[in-house]
């Protein structure tokens, strides 16, 4: 319903404001990975132009198959959470449990796309590799920004 959607939007806006105010570098990492996931994946799909599996689909997709956008997106989104988790969860046991669950979630999203018949396993593997590569490139920049922003805030 309309009020539910609007209140959900309001909660997201408030959460983004809090994250921006106190964790700007983490927000930078999320935005960076989201933009790359959207734009980069679309461009790669147009470059490779790989058709989807021809077997019976449980869902209908209208774009090309390689790389899997769900695999890229889940790797980037949940992978980003995995990387910044130490900021938010100090208890090592709880943090490890959450990290394991997020890792299983990333894997299961890939498996579900194969099960639904909309991707080949290589599409999923390519999506995981692309997402992981972008995380490995973005994370050092995030760490540098985090250090600089934390240092600047202590100077004020």
Locate predicted features.
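Transmembrane alpha-helix boundary/anchor motif
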Residues: 21-22, 38-43, 80, 136-137
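Small-polar-interrupted transmembrane alpha-helices in polytopic inner-membrane proteins
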Residues: 30-50, 98-111
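Membrane-embedded catalytic cores of phosphoryl/pyrophosphoryl-handling enzymes
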Residues: 54-156
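Short, small-residue-biased leader/transition segments that mark boundaries at the very start
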Residues: 2-7
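Interfacial segments of alpha-helical transmembrane regions
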Residues: 12-37
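Hydrophobic alpha-helical transmembrane segments
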Residues: 13-17, 42-51, 69-80
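Helix-loop junctions at the membrane-solvent interface of multi-pass transporters
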Residues: 19, 47-48, 142-145
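Core hydrophobic alpha-helical membrane-spanning segments
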Residues: 11-15, 104-107
């Amino acid at each position: 319903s309309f009020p539910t959607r609007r209140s959900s939007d309001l909660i997201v806006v408030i959460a983004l404001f809090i994250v921006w105010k106190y964790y700007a570098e983490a927000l930078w990492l999320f935005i960076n990975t989201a933009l790359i996931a959207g734009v980069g994946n679309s461009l790669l799909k147009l470059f490779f132009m790989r058709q989807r599996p021809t077997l019976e689909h449980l869902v209908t997709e209208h774009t090309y198959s390689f790389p899997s956008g769900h695999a890229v997106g889940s790797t980037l989104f949940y992978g980003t959470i995995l990387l910044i988790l130490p900021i938010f969860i100090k208890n090592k046991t709880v943090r490890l449990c959450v990290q394991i669950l997020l890792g299983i979630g990333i894997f299961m999203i890939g498996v579900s796309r194969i099960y639904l018949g909309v991707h080949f396993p290589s599409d999923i593997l390519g999506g995981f590799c692309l997402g992981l590569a972008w995380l490995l490139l973005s994370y050092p920049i995030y760490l540098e920004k985090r250090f600089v922003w934390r240092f600047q805030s202590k100077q004020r």
